[in-house]
Structure formats: C-alpha cells, structure tokens
C-alpha cells in the first residue's frame, strides 16, 4: 500500500513538472508572445493623431487630424481651432470653429459656454494645404490606447494635446 501511494505521489509530481515545463518552454511560446505583442501595437479601438507642423520661430502653425473620427484641429498663433461638424447650423455658407485660448478655456470651465467663430476656410482646405506641403507625411503620429491612456472624447484628446505641449495656447 505504501508503495502504491509513493507511486501515485511520484506520478503527480512528474505530471506537475511536465505541465510547468510545457508552460514555460512551449515550442510555440515565442510565436504566441510575438502575436500578442503585435496585437497590442495595432490601432484596434484606439485612436491616433497625425500632426502636421509648419511652425516657424515667430509663430505656431500645426494641423491635428484625429482618426478614426476625422476631427480636425488647427493651432495657429497661440489659438486652437476645433472644426465642428455642424457647420451650417451656426454659420450659413461658412464653417463653424470652436476657439480655444487661455481666456476661453477659463470661460468654458466657469460657464460651460464655448467660444465659436465663423470662417470661410474649411477643414478640407486646411488638410489639402498641410498634406500637400508635407507630401502626406505627418511630422508626428501619436497613438492613444483608449483603455490605458484616455477615456476617449474629443475634449479629452484636446486636453491631452495641450497638457503634453503639442498645442501652443496663449496663457491669456
């Protein structure tokens, strides 16, 4: 009987050793880890921001295209313009932009009212201008993972860009 129990204990120990060895030294472990690493680096469910920079030492001029939503932000001379989709509602025959400066951000925080303006320059015109000058090659591309970096709204992305210094806004 003692011999039988020792044999069972030895068999269990041998089985556990084989299970641990297979887990740590599985023949496909490298490939599985590479697949998981590649999956983590894809843009599934995340967002990316393409930054086109035409700035000079005298002034800032940057275009941000936030994909997959295709939101356009334009940073010119310490003001950030957010092109709204509801262009014809506020400005007939023109495009509506929300303006962000230091003063308007304080107003939004205090009252919840955004500063909007009308412009004849559309977001498509800006995209064609920047993409044409940069040969469709952005200066920077930021990849934001929704689960780990940001609870995704456009305002969160704008705050992220301001906080990390990609947007130049007047302190005003």
Swiss-Prot record:
InterPro entries: AcMNPV_PIF-4
UniProt-listed Pfam families: Baculo_19
Top-level taxon of the source organism: Viruses
Homology family: Belongs to the baculoviridae 19 kDa protein family.
Entry protein name: Uncharacterized 19.4 kDa protein
Organism (species): Orgyia pseudotsugata multicapsid polyhedrosis virus
């Amino acid at each position: 009987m003692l011999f039988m129990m020792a044999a069972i204990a030895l068999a269990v120990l041998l089985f556990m050793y084989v299970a641990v060895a297979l887990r740590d030294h599985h023949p496909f472990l490298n490939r599985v880890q590479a697949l998981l690493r590649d999956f983590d680096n894809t843009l599934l469910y995340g967002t990316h921001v393409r930054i086109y920079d035409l700035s000079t030492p005298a002034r800032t001029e940057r275009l941000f295209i936030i994909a997959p939503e295709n939101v356009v932000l334009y940073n010119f001379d310490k003001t950030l313009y957010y092109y709204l989709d509801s262009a014809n509602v506020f400005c007939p025959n023109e495009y509506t932009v929300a303006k962000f400066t230091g003063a308007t951000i304080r107003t939004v925080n205090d009252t919840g009212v955004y500063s909007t303006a009308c412009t004849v320059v559309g977001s498509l015109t800006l995209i064609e201008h920047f993409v044409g000058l940069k040969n469709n090659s952005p200066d920077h591309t930021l990849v934001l993972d929704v689960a780990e970096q940001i609870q995704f709204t456009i305002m969160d992305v704008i705050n992220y860009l301001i906080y990390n210094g990609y947007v130049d806004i007047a302190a005003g």
